[in-house]
């Protein structure tokens, strides 16, 4: 869990920032964001080049020291949840936030300064654009924004739906209903019930947008959306179009999946509930936000779905425990030529849930000292899911170790989609062939079960793509003032129908604020990174399989045992954020442009099957 570069200036503080965790065509005009995003300062305020260089060096030293302290305090909190550790972590986060805020404000003094060397210019932009929600310079407005941010998160965290009989359901309980129920009336009640928590957020969110835009303009950006997009090594105005180009590449596969799923749902619920040729009602897809459709697998699965093995049962039969599962993950990376993990990793990580205290069980990878104090924190169960998650989390650790030689601001992924993509890429290599090489399978199963495996992955990964794209498309339009509070909800559903082919199940109330029912909106967490991670992981996987000499379909490829693949992967990882992400991408794939066609290659057998199933069906949506 690398503490990235996001914190906002002193006299202003506020709401704790979320930690920030790209794109394609080779003809895109990539250029340093510092040349494209920041308003030029009056000549009288321009500081000397040497002063700028010294400022950056001093800022890195200060932020690195505070970040390491905060990382240690956060680790203690995650492993020992008490009132005292919460207070210590909050104080540490406040100190780090204040320092970052001060640094961002100071960095804006150098706007428009010519003659800067590459690293100084790049790092100045990082210091300014790394803040998620910039506060205005006015202390009263800063305090107001801090209070709004805390209130929005609190409203979401305390949210629940209370039925007429007085019984109240928290989000987790409502999510269980969405995942398990097949009663459309019950699903609709749970879906609409959760959205009763968000209307009260709308005026607060609208005010937060005003304040954050003011803060962004004071740092030299047109608005907050421009500031967020400035982190992608290209003209922020061009970035949304580049994302749409990626979406256009993969949308035929999504539309085929959508067509099949809608037809099967119509068979289950009837055409009155699921009209032909229209958007799928959002409450029927097994997830509170219709962002993942895994929970309706049995309704849409191909007829031949057996994988031929039960990995959870095999792991238990073979006597695996938490440590041996992590050792197996480490051995995967060793087979690629990476060094073994340090002894401190095994001494300091959390692998199983303690019996004597509460801990944060959500799996995460940590880099405490930004050198070699690597750790993971998991409450590992011996099952197939955690076996995959371990490989994913170790991918973060090896990425963190690879870029440790870079300076503080460059110790991060090439863009905020790369870190998650690397973890997911390595999880794609957990194939039957890999399991056979480990001795967990006697032989590699034939391809008869591949469609079922691919369908499960598509319901997780392909269904997510349009949602991952549209959340920030909505926010950017809000930040740019293209729509006011009265139009927030209408725009939200316009974008959901345009990209997802998913619609609200009925008219929404006039005061509805459905974006607020998704944590990342009131929590102010940028979302494009998740879309990018889904695209990148398949592009990485295809390139690594080619480097490894794989001749099988890429959904059956594992790079286990390939030193050549490991060398190319490390060449990208060790760059960190020192170069524009197209350079890092080219170091691995040979091309600087993101390319979603790797997804089409991976899911080609499923696409062919879907096209057969959809013959004669009315696909698309109005």
Model-derived features: positions:
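Active-site scaffold of zinc-dependent metalloenzymes
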Residues: 185-188, 192, 356-383, 390, ...
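Bacterial N-terminal signal peptides that target proteins for export
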Residues: 2-11
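Glycine- and acidic
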Residues: 190-197, 229, 236-240, 305-318, ...
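C-terminal, non-catalytic "cap/extension" segments appended to globular domains
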Residues: 25, 30-52, 84-86, 125-129, ...
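Post-HExxH zinc-binding segment in Zn-dependent metallohydrolases
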Residues: 243-253, 413-453
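C-terminal motif of bacterial Sec signal peptides marking the signal peptidase cleavage site
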Residues: 18-21
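N-terminal helix-rich structural modules
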Residues: 30, 37-207, 225, 518-521, ...
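Active-site-proximal, well-structured secondary-structure segments within enzyme catalytic domains
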Residues: 166-173, 207-377, 446-447, 451-458, ...
């Amino acid at each position: 869990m690398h503490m990235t570069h996001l914190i906002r200036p002193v006299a202003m503080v506020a709401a704790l920032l979320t930690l920030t965790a790209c794109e394609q065509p080779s003809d895109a005009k990539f250029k340093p964001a510092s040349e494209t995003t920041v308003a030029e300062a009056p000549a009288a305020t321009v500081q000397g080049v040497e002063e700028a260089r010294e400022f950056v060096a001093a800022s890195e030293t200060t932020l690195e020291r505070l970040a390491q302290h905060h990382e240690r305090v956060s680790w203690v909190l995650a492993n020992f949840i008490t009132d005292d550790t919460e207070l210590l972590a909050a104080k540490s986060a406040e100190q780090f936030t204040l320092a970052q805020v001060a640094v961002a404000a100071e960095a804006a003094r150098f706007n428009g300064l010519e003659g800067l060397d590459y690293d100084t210019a790049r790092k100045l932009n990082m210091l300014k654009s790394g803040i998620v929600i910039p506060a205005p310079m006015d202390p009263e407005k800063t305090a107001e924004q801090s209070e709004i941010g805390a209130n929005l998160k609190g409203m979401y965290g305390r949210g629940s739906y209370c039925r007429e009989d007085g019984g109240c359901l928290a989000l987790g309980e409502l999510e269980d209903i969405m995942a398990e129920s097949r009663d459309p009336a019950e699903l609709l009640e749970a879906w609409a019930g959760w959205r009763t928590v968000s209307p009260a957020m709308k005026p607060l969110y609208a005010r937060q947008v005003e304040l954050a835009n003011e803060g962004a303009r004071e740092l030299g950006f047109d608005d907050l959306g421009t500031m967020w997009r400035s982190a992608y090594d290209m003209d922020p105005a061009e970035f949304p179009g580049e994302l749409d180009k990626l979406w256009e590449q993969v949308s035929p596969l999504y539309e085929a999946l959508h067509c099949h799923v809608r037809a099967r749902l119509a068979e289950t619920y009837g055409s009155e509930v699921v009209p032909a040729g229209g958007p799928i009602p959002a409450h029927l897809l097994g997830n509170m936000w219709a962002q993942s459709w895994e929970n309706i697998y049995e309704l849409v699965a191909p007829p031949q779905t057996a994988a031929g093995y039960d990995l959870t049962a095999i792991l238990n039969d073979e006597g695996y425990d938490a440590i041996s599962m992590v050792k197996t993950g480490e051995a995967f990376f060793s087979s690629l030529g990476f060094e073994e993990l340090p002894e401190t990793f095994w001494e300091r990580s959390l692998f199983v849930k303690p019996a004597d205290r509460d801990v944060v069980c959500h799996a995460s990878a940590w880099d405490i000292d930004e050198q070699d104090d690597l750790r993971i924190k998991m409450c590992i169960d011996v099952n197939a899911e955690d076996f995959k998650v371990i490989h994913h989390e170790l991918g973060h650790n090896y990425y963190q170790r690879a870029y440790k030689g870079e300076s503080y601001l460059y110790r991060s992924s090439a863009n905020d989609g790369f870190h998650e993509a690397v973890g997911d890429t390595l999880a794609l290599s957990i194939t039957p062939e890999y399991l056979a090489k480990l001795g967990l399978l006697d032989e590699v199963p034939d391809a008869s079960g591949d469609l079922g495996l691919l369908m499960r992955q598509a319901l997780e990964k392909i269904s997510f793509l349009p949602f991952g794209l549209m959340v920030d498309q909505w926010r950017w339009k809000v930040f740019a003032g293209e729509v006011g509070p009265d139009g927030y909800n209408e725009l939200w559903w316009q974008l959901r129908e345009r990209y997802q082919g998913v619609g609200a199940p009925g008219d929404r109330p006039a005061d509805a604020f459905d974006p607020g029912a998704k944590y990342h909106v009131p929590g102010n967490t940028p979302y494009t990174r998740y879309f990018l991670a889904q695209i990148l992981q398949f592009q990485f996987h295809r390139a690594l399989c080619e480097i490894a000499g794989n001749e099988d379909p890429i959904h059956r490829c594992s790079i286990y045992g390939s030193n050549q693949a490991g060398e190319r992967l490390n060449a990208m990882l060790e760059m960190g954020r020192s170069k524009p992400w197209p350079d890092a991408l080219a170091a691995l794939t040979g091309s600087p442009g993101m390319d979603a066609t790797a997804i089409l290659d991976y899911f080609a057998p499923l696409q062919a099957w879907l096209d057969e199933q959809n013959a004669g069906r009315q696909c698309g949506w109005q």
